[in-house]
From Swiss-Prot:
This is Leukotoxin-activating lysine-acyltransferase LtxC. Required for full activity and modification of the LtxA leukotoxin. Involved in fatty acid modification of the protoxin at two internal lysine residues, thereby converting it to the active toxin. Belongs to the RTX toxin acyltransferase family. GO terms for molecular function: acyltransferase activity. InterPro entries: RTX_toxin-activating_protC_bac (IPR003996). It comes from Aggregatibacter actinomycetemcomitans.
Length: 168
């Protein structure tokens, strides 16, 4: 995407952030951390209706190491982290005007064979929970097995990390 279009895209996303009860009070630095790499890598979807943005979704392809880094601090990802592996994470999901289901259907159709996870945060909460998403053509049982494998790998890596820390 051309640089001028990147600025236009950033404007659309900033407008959605300003209209989102969850995002509107977040800092400009969080907007930059969460949105600029997605735009630069083309790892986003923007839905428009009558020339007006109605929903936005961005994702990162993380390595296990960067997944752990992200889970420990959601604002820790740097540009190179966004394409460091094959573990897909939704970074932003914004539909402030009631188009959440439209975005959901669009993503299932656009990524029919992909698996994603996200950290879901509710307005007024400082904690999030991991949610899972699979494309429209992925067998649900297979998706569950793969997600279980992801969790197993994540837990083992966290255990190994804590053992290394406690030894030192």
């Amino acid at each position: 995407m051309e640089k001028n279009n990147n600025f236009e895209m950033l404007g659309y996303v900033a407008w959605l952030w300003a209209n989102s009860p969850l995002h509107r009070n977040w800092s400009l630095s969080l907007l930059a951390i969460n949105v600029l790499p997605a735009i630069q890598y083309g790892q986003y979807t923007l839905l428009m209706r009558d020339g007006v943005p109605i929903a936005f979704c961005s994702w990162a392809n993380l390595s296990l190491e960067n997944e752990i880094k992200y889970l420990e601090d959601v604002s820790s990802l740097v540009y190179d982290d966004w394409n460091s592996g094959d573990r897909k994470w939704f970074i932003d999901w914004i539909a402030p005007f009631g188009h959440n289901y439209v975005l959901y259907k669009h993503m299932r159709k656009s990524f029919p064979y992909d698996l994603f996870r996200s950290i879901r945060v509710y307005k007024g909460s400082s904690e999030g929970k991991i949610t899972e998403f699979h494309g429209g053509k992925v067998d649900k049982q297979l998706a569950n097995k793969i997600f279980q494998q992801y969790h197993f790998e994540l837990i083992n890596e966290l255990k190994n990390k804590s053992e290394v820390i406690s030894i030192n």
